[in-house]
Amino acid sequence: MQLNDLRSAPGARREKLRPGRGIGSGLGKTGGRGHKGQTSRSGGKIAPGFEGGQQPLHRRLPKFGFVSLKAMDRAEVRTSELAKVEGDVVTVQSLKDANVINQNVQRVKVMLSGEVGRAVTLKGIAATKGARAAIEAAGGKFEE
């Protein structure tokens, strides 16, 4: 037996259905679309979410929530990410330059997560109590 002799077992593959090609096919005449009506016509699709004129579900349910604009210009930074900044002074701009935060961020807060590798000075950056203690324990300081 060669690779070019391989064949599927009889009955393993079904033939493609050809609607509208005679009554013997099982899909003759109406071709499985039923009689009359919108969906029997060519191009007769119903829009997604349309419920036959009844008020659709997405309009019956109330709206809720909103997107806070404050979230767009604020960011949280882990203490372990401070090592990615070159130099001893960490500012918002230096975090942007090191690709730690997004370019549209204006306010940053440091969270305690990971180790503080070296002494750094943070200018204009807030920190949680735990992060502040860890940075100061490593010899770092804060400036406004």
From Swiss-Prot:
Example of a GO MF term: rRNA binding
What's this chain's function? Binds to the 23S rRNA.
| Annotated protein name in UniProt | Large ribosomal subunit protein uL15
Q: Name one GO cellular component term.
A: cytosolic large ribosomal subunit
Question: Does the record carry Transferase as a key word?
Answer: no
Protein family according to the UniProt entry: Belongs to the universal ribosomal protein uL15 family.
Q: How does it assemble?
A: Part of the 50S ribosomal subunit.
Has the keyword Ribosomal protein been applied to this entry?
yes
> Which SUPFAM superfamilies does the record match to this protein?
Ribosomal proteins L15p and L18e
Tell me the superkingdom of the source: Bacteria
The UniProt regions of compositional bias labelled Gly residues, in chain numbering, are: 21-31
Task: Please give the residue ranges the record annotates as the region Disordered.
Answer: 1-57
Give the GO biological process terms.
translation
Q: Which PROSITE patterns match?
A: RIBOSOMAL_L15 (PS00475)
Any one Pfam family here would be Ribosomal_L27A
Cross-referenced NCBIfam families, in alphabetical order? rplO_bact
Q: Which UniProt keywords apply?
A: Ribonucleoprotein, Ribosomal protein, RNA-binding, rRNA-binding
